[in-house]
Amino acid sequence: MDRKILTYDSVEISFGGKAVIHDVSFSLEHGEILGLVGESGSGKSTLIKAAVGLLGSDGLVTRGDIRYMDQNILDIPEKEKRKIRGAKIGMIFQDAGASLCPIRTIGEQIYESMCAHTKITRSEAKTRAMDLFDKLNFKDSQRVWDSYPFELSGGMNQRAGIAIAMLMNPPILFADEPTSALDVSVQRQVVKEMLKLRELFGTAIVIVTHDIGVVRAMADTVLVLKNGKTIEYGTADRVLDHPQDPYTRKLLEAVPKLQRKVRV
């Protein structure tokens, strides 16, 4: 039985007619964590945005296929893509605080987000949110629910963003540089929480990062990008411990901030 939940097949992405992603292929199984690594500008974020229709008016997948289960995402109408985005593929951004509405409480935003995908009462939404907050070891769930984003720390906003992305229990989570704006202690907490999601729900995760330490702590497989091209792709142990390409070896020179011992 084919367990692939997401497949990129020879994908090329262009902006203004110029290709920036070249012939990239990878697949993701249920519960797998893929680390997408490379320097800034290598095309990491562009790759995941293509799957959820966030390339903007100038961006276009010009070759290849992106399949969720057996469905080619590129062939479906925008209305159907919106159903996949959030309900089937959740997203966490680098700065969750910036993506949250500053004039609505976290609780209000959770309720509105869930209403976009399912019929649910405010009470039911709060119950589900509080349950997930507790599973992710939030110390003061009620305070988070009642707070505006500006009343929370950057780290707490990021953790709330993870919870919001997961409340519909999407099978796939895209995490775009989720730890880069955080100090090391909060990085560890966020990594633990994403690993906890995999443990609780079998969530498959694509994490975009330039931090090799985060990749070592989380990933089962690793894809290294440079200038929109695949440099290496394989198991985390093989790519990180026995890199074949000089570019990968250069990336690994940085001392990792996190170790695999944070895996839950």
What annotation goes with each model-predicted range?
Residues 60-72:
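Conserved ABC transporter NBD signature motif
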Residues 37-39:
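The feature captures the beta-strand-to-loop junction immediately N-terminal to the Walker
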